[in-house]
């Protein structure tokens, strides 16, 4: 199978040939930061365009068509517009926390993004506690949201921030329990190790019914963590104007907007990594010719195809389901998803021991 690890190995050997160790490390850090930021921005623009087209499809429209062929540059035009907008200074806000909140949200998203293994050797960090790292770092974003609501000194932003905090903290529990079933099945917390163990079968297949239940719960809880419909109560326009980022404008609003789309990608990428084999191809036992053909497809392409299928499911849910009330949203977590997740961990233990 074709992997991209030879590219990173070649760059490392090339730098070691001409630079001392300290400079090699510095240059590699700069290159990694540059690539992450470029990939972050490009993925956000792509996801915005994809959502507009998917939304148009479900509403029997065409979507963006004017800027560039098939409207592909509409997201770029919108990005330029938002960068040129004025940063409006609001009276009676906590200036330090008001500005800090935007950076906390975006940094939490970038740190999580950097830990995702896109291909063999194509990840920034590969901790031996990778699953715990993802859960902990991705949870930092809620601090930025709470600060944004509080610092704005606005009743709508405070209500939106409190809703978002309650929602994220609640659904984080189901997310974590779902991922623990994969850890039990794989026997490892390291993301690259979990992916490589799926070379003989994806976890969603190897884990049977408990893995399927965990996958479904993770998709629901992960979608709720992104604050997107039908779980978009923190940004309910009819009640809270724009929720916790009502008072933000220009690039500061763009940071929240950017983080929302990248969080959607991160949730789908984690689902792909832990449940759908990551960069591993689809293999069917006994179908040797089919398996050989699948091996010719580049591994990074497998990763992105699976990830974008999960993203399409999230967009499908968003544009077809009505918004939940706050009591329905919390009842779904505490009375349905949480008990099922706890029972599912016991089921996975029995599956591992007896099957």
Curated annotation (Swiss-Prot):
Signal peptide: none annotated. NDH-1 is composed of 14 different subunits. Subunits NuoA, H, J, K, L, M, N constitute the membrane sector of the complex. Its EC number is 7.1.1.-. It is an enzyme of class 7 (translocase). The keyword Transmembrane helix applies. Its main location: membrane. It comes from the Bacteria. NDH-1 shuttles electrons from NADH, via FMN and iron-sulfur (Fe-S) centers, to quinones in the respiratory chain. The immediate electron acceptor for the enzyme in this species is believed to be ubiquinone. Couples the redox reaction to proton translocation (for every two electrons transferred, four hydrogen ions are translocated across the cytoplasmic membrane), and thus conserves the redox energy in a proton gradient. This subunit may bind ubiquinone. One of its GO terms (cellular component) is plasma membrane. It comes from Azobacteroides pseudotrichonymphae genomovar. CFP2. This is NADH-quinone oxidoreductase subunit H. Keywords: Cell inner membrane, Cell membrane, Membrane, NAD, Quinone, Translocase, Transmembrane, Transmembrane helix, Ubiquinone. GO terms for molecular function: NADH dehydrogenase activity; oxidoreductase activity, acting on NAD(P)H, quinone or similar compound as acceptor; quinone binding. Belongs to the complex I subunit 1 family. It catalyses: a quinone + NADH + 5 H(+)(in) = a quinol + NAD(+) + 4 H(+)(out). The lineage of its organism: Bacteria, Pseudomonadati, Bacteroidota, Bacteroidia, Bacteroidales. It is found in: Cell inner membrane. PROSITE patterns: COMPLEX1_ND1_1 (PS00667), COMPLEX1_ND1_2 (PS00668). The chain crosses the membrane at residues 29-49, 96-116, 129-149, 175-195, 204-224, 264-284, 296-316, 335-355. The gene is nuoH. One of its GO terms (biological process) is aerobic respiration. It is a multi-pass membrane protein.
């Amino acid at each position: 199978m074709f992997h991209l690890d030879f590219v990173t190995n070649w760059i490392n050997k090339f730098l070691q040939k001409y630079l001392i160790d300290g400079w090699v490390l510095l240059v590699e850090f700069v290159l990694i930061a540059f690539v992450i930021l470029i990939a972050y921005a490009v993925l956000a623009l792509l996801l915005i365009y994809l959502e507009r087209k998917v939304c148009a499809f479900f509403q029997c429209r065409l979507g963006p068509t004017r800027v560039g062929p098939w409207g592909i540059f509409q997201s770029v035009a919108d990005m330029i517009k938002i960068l040129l907008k004025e940063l409006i200074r609001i009276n009676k806000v906590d200036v330090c926390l008001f500005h800090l909140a935007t950076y906390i949200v975006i940094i939490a998203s970038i740190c999580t993004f950097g830990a995702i293994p896109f291909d063999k050797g194509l990840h920034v960090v590969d901790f031996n506690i990778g699953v715990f790292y993802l859960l902990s770092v991705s949870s930092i974003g809620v601090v930025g949201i709470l600060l944004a609501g509080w610092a704005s000194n606005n009743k709508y932003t405070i209500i939106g921030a409190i809703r978002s905090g309650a929602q994220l903290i609640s659904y984080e529990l189901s997310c974590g329990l779902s991922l623990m079933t994969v850890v039990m099945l794989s026997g490892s917390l390291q993301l690259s190790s979990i992916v490589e163990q799926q070379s003989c079968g994806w976890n969603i297949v190897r884990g049977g019914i408990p893995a399927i239940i965990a996958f479904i719960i993770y998709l629901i809880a992960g979608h709720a963590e992104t604050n997107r419909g039908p779980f978009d109560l923190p940004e309910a326009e009819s009640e809270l104007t724009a929720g916790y980022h009502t008072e933000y404008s220009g690039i500061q609003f763009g940071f929240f907007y950017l983080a929302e789309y990248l969080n959607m990608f991160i949730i789908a990428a984690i689902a792909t990594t832990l449940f759908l084999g990551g960069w591993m191809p689809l293999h069917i036992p006994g179908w040797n010719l089919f398996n050989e053909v699948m091996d010719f497809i580049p591994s990074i392409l497998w990763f992105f195809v699976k990830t974008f299928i999960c993203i399409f499911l999230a967009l499908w849910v968003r544009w077809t389901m009505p918004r939940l009330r706050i009591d329905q949203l919390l009842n779904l977590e505490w009375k349905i998803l949480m008990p099922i997740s706890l029972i599912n961990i016991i089921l996975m233990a029995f599956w591992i021991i007896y099957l």
